[in-house]
């Protein structure tokens, strides 16, 4: 009988550890800095203001952080896009966002363009990029045509992922059910992650 309780106790510890890993970046770490949310688009185009306001609300609600909207977008020129795939170069674009970072503020650029990463040629697209306290998030691949309500859930998860990294210094991990999973490569994987 003693062994049964010991096994149950050990299983409980294992599950508690897994839950801690799942919430480590969002609920467990307080924000260390505010975030500037900035639209990223081409001249003459614009990122939906309603999308940005919703994103700011999600980040404030989920992370308890101060989020402000940038007054002006980061504009992209033609050299930010691959000439054949017409995807934005995530590394190039996050470098354009980075100058907005200050010693006491992180920055997250939000774009509706499809992205690729020259650093990950094994992947046909990128959902975002990060460099220090600068991040970039693409909404392009978040759509779930089979379940349209899931589109916003996916986007919320990506916002919390980047927000937790940029504002809370949350580390990535190897738990595929965590928003901070290091191996995230597709929007479908977001469906398996808790919020």
Give the role of each language-model region:
Residues 170-194:
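Post-HEXXH active-site segment of zinc metalloproteases
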Residues 39-41, 140-143, 184:
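Short, histidine-centered active-site or binding-site loop motifs used for metal coordination
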Residues 9, 124-126, 195:
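Short intrinsically disordered coil segments
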Residues 49-162, 166-170:
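Metzincin-family zinc-dependent endopeptidase catalytic domain
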Residues 21-31:
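Ser/Thr/Pro/Gly-rich low-complexity linker/stalk segments immediately outside membranes or between
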Residues 1-5:
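Feature marks short, highly hydrophobic, charge-poor N-terminal signal-anchor/signal peptide-like helices
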Residues 8-16:
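Hydrophobic membrane-insertion alpha-helices, especially the h-region
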Residues 32-47:
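Fold-level signature of zinc-dependent metallopeptidase catalytic domains
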């Amino acid at each position: 009988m003693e062994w049964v309780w010991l096994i149950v106790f050990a299983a409980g510890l294992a599950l508690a550890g897994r839950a801690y890993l799942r919430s480590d970046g969002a609920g467990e770490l307080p924000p260390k800095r505010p975030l500037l949310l900035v639209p990223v688009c081409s001249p003459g185009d614009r990122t939906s203001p309603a999308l940005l306001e919703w994103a700011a609300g999600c980040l404030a609600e989920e992370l308890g952080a101060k989020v402000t909207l940038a007054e002006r977008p980061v504009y992209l020129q033609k050299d930010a896009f691959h000439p054949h795939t017409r995807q934005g170069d995530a590394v190039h674009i996050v470098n354009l966002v980075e100058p907005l970072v200050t010693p006491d503020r992180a920055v997250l650029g939000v774009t509706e363009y499809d992205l690729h990463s020259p650093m990950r040629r094994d992947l046909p697209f990128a959902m975002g990029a990060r460099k220090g306290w600068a991040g970039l998030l693409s909404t392009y691949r978040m759509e779930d045509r089979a379940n349209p309500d899931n589109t916003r859930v996916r986007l919320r998860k990506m916002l919390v992922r980047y927000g937790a990294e940029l504002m809370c210094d949350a580390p990535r991990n190897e738990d595929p059910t965590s928003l901070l999973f290091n191996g995230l490569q597709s929007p479908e994987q977001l469906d398996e992650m808790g919020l």
